Amino acid sequence: MFILIIKCGIMEKEVISSREFIDRFVECLEKGEDFKLKDCVVEGNVDILNIYEMIKDKELKGGYIEKKDDEIVVNINIKVDIYNVEFNGDFRFFVNMEYQIVISVFNGNAYFRVITFKGSVYFIRTIFNGDVDFIDTIFEENAYFSVTAFKGNIINFSGTIFNKESHFKSTTFEGNTYFSVTTFNIAEFYNSTFKSHVYFDDISFNLLSFTDCRFRDDVSFKKIDKENFKGLAIFLKTQFLNKHTTIENFQLSKTSFLKTDVREVLLCDVKKEEILSHKILRIKEDSGNKDKDLENKLKELLGLSYKYIIDQFNYKSVLAEYRNLRISIENNRTYIEASNLYKMEMELIKEFSNGRFEKFIIGAYGAISDYGESMEKTGKWILGSMILFTILASILRFKGMEWDIFKIIEFWWISFWEVIRLFLQIGTEDKSLWILEPIIRVTSLILLGNLYIAVRRKLSRK
């Protein structure tokens, strides 16, 4: 089979017009020959409407065009291989006319490798029936892949740079999908479905948003920190349907898993920090201790989606996120991190509690035992209270005595022993301690109860 190759220059790129690009593209379509373009600069807009206009009056023996009620489908029945090309205008393979839309269907493999798109790129409602490769490609303006179907075995965006917004709304990825070593500015995945393996390894971003998305097979996320990148990630109502899901180096202070079940997700490199959803909830509630810098960042990055996203946050949903995260971390046997999350979960409950008494009780629980997470802290409270009660008991029992060292030691020892008896709920026959007895008993119940919770929690995690 003869393959038409457009090769523009060897040492430096030659400039061609978008009209020449379209002429050669249509020529390949008519002849059924693969289209190759290499080492060129294309000036002007590339528009599927111009391709449609050139072939609509020709015989449709190749099945290039299908007309439906409200759309015109341009079938690209050839392989497309474009390498090291710079497009200086918009690249539109979707056009919305007054009464009809023009969409594209790539029936062969589509390779756009080492490309620079200087204008906006539109692959809206496009169908890729073969493999797709955008490796090492730069999108300098917005890129739209909404309502797009990637049906091939391989979808590769590795090494790609999205300098502005990238939209993947209601997009379907059927084959193995690679976004490895990819740089996003603002990436929005909304109502998208990933049916096979997905790799978001070594990525960097300002905002990465997954809303109402579904991952049916295993998926791995690994973020790398870059200077001047905010690294905010939002997983809202996202479904991870495979147990082999790994999320690495996504700091909880910059990541929200609101209404997302992560109980069986492996979260790596979790540090002690307040989760992003807790901070956003403060912004929504307009509390006095909200993070104003974060609020401004979210407004800037989310744009028109800001109100919709922010309205999803409420006390119960954020509390559920804390608990899901804690269960996930406990399942991965990283108990120290799980303990830290539980403390912050209790801080959330205290912060949004309505009653002063409830806030006091929760605060006391935290002060005594770190919400049942610290045996050491509770032990210090027990020791300190017993010393204090021994002093008070000695004062109540004092009726005068000889200043003999052994008598003094004996006196203090008896006081200490009486306090221990009361602390262990055994009781005392010393009537002089009747005032102190109920105080010691109540304190004992509180402190020993906290110690029991801390010990049980520690043993359950062994």
UniProtKB/Swiss-Prot annotation:
Its main location: membrane. The chain crosses the membrane at residues 381-401, 433-453. It is found in: Cell membrane. It is a multi-pass membrane protein. InterPro entries: 5peptide_repeat (IPR001646). One of its GO terms (cellular component) is plasma membrane. Pfam families: Pentapeptide_3 (PF13576). Keywords: Cell membrane, Membrane, Transmembrane, Transmembrane helix. This is Uncharacterized protein MJ1147. It comes from Methanocaldococcus jannaschii (strain ATCC 43067 / DSM 2661 / JAL-1 / JCM 10045 / NBRC 100440) (Methanococcus jannaschii).
